[in-house]
Amino acid sequence: MNIIDEGQPFTVIVDYAHAPDALEKVFDSIGAHKGRIISVHGGAGRRDPSTRPIRGAILAKYSDLVIITEDDSRDEDPEKIAEGFIKGAEKAGMKLGKDLIKELDREKAIKLAIESAKPGDLVLLLGKGHEKTILRADGPHDFEDIKVAKKYIRQYHQ
């Protein structure tokens, strides 16, 4: 778990959590939070699709805003991956376009989370953690949640 502090009036945490139990542990470790919780998460391609709705439901249970995005889609359709998360989050009570957003471009998803954050909020960037690449159908691409988050914090909250 990495806390990003660029002097912004809200908290940003980057964590590798990508399995249901790991997500639960992240939310348990946070405890009660006074501001909103904004979670950015996606699922890897060629991994167990049955966990996607479960993870969507976990995100919905603990978050005020969930942004579903890409995460190492490999050769699997990112839209298809996102569908599983959305189904779980909707079943748990979230509404697409209201408190549940699909933004498959991970950088844009992080930007949206940072732009949306207000003083006292908590932004969770989940699933990639320390990784320095994102795996797409055409191969690996340089990508770091921490660098992207810092870029948009500096742009919108300095």
Where on the chain are the PLM-derived regions?
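ATP-dependent carboxylate-amine ligase
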Residues: N2-Q158
